[in-house]
Amino acid sequence: MDPKGYVFIRCPDPGHPNAKSKPGWIAEHVWVMSQVLGRPLRRGESVHHINNIKHDNRAENLELWHTHQPKGARVEDTVRWARWFLAEYGAEFPVTS
């Protein structure tokens, strides 16, 4: 466990793109989420611990977060970003409501 409370594990896949901060190691919550998704995390994605306990890396306690447009963005830029976001994630996370 690191000083911030995150658990690091030996990366089962040494070439995993998310195992770059400590060569050969990966944050366990990142590994778990990448296994749930079936792919590495992409640029701008992060993993949030729902209960805020950083060593509770059960899949059901993790959420995939993505950085969003900054406040004050022009509407046309926000619409362009929203179209990109839906194209990027729409098939993985279909709208259910």
What are these regions, as identified by a protein language model?
Residues 1-46, 53-93:
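Conserved recognition-core residues within compact binding domains
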Residues 95-97:
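Short intrinsically disordered terminal tails
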